[in-house]
Amino acid sequence: MFEAAKARQRSQISFGVISVALLVASACADTSDPADMQERLNPMIGLHEQGQSQFGMYAPANRRGRGGAAGEQKTPTQLAQETLGFTESDYIFSGSMEGSVERALPAWTSYVEALKEAGATIRTNPLVVKTPGIAEDLELATRNIGAQLNTGVSGVMFVGVESADEVRHGLAAMRFAANGGSRSEDVGNAPAYWGISEAEYRTRADLWPLNPEGELINWTIVESLEGLANVREIAAVEGIGVLWPGAGTLRGLFSTRDASGGRVLDEEAWEASIQQVLDACKEFDIACGFPANENDIGMRIEQGFSVFVMNWGDAGFRTIDVGRQASGR
């Protein structure tokens, strides 16, 4: 009888432990983050949250012929159809407004409208654009960023960044006043491209990861000696989504002319500058971006880069294929 009583006691204890475990699991499920249950609009942020690499393309564009003469010009509709014909790109990138938003905005707006008419949305083709340098004119930078966001973009890249303060100013320009920012209350055509109401857009068009439910992302690029000197202070600014070394510009900084006038790259110094930015990304737990090609994307993934942009065309398409295979996507 004594042994039977002990067996019943063990059974009761086991049942009690299981019951407590089930209650704890239920409580954890009931207190899950609402952001996890809300449908993510911007798939780029979804990939970040999943720890996945991502691969994007420069938007196709009309090119100049020899001597600057215009070749056969494609319409915005044709460019949009060309864009949507390649489905392996996680986002569409454009540097067309780096020199001047005012000059390039009309063509970009027409292109985005053509994308929308062809069926694109933030869910299928999120858009990222370069904005001109911020530090030279802070007031103009705020207007520029607002105008770009109003076209429906979900990411803005700050170029030539050299200080933490200019990053903070740019990040504020991406956020409405209700979220502590300086963006105008005008939303332009952004809700239409996102496929949501204006009211919902105002709620969701905030900066991730500062707002875990936000759908906007910032990219910041360091591409000068001063920027490199301040890269840790820049990377420490909360709100940067992806930090990039400006590989092309940095290549120029670490190149000289030989006796015949040819360019000579200091490969070691150039690579050290790239690794300096990558080290800052790792220290402050920020995704790091790189403009890779099919020959180096595997190496860059191994080093720790996770966001890549490629030029439009066959070489870029091949690079995405190589990158997806190397990253397990």
What are these regions, as identified by a protein language model?
Residues 1-11:
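N-terminal secretory signal peptides that target proteins for export/translocation
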Residues 10-20:
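Sec-dependent N-terminal signal peptides
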Residues 33-329:
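Expand to "…catalyze enediolate/carbanion chemistry for C-C bond making/breaking, isomerization
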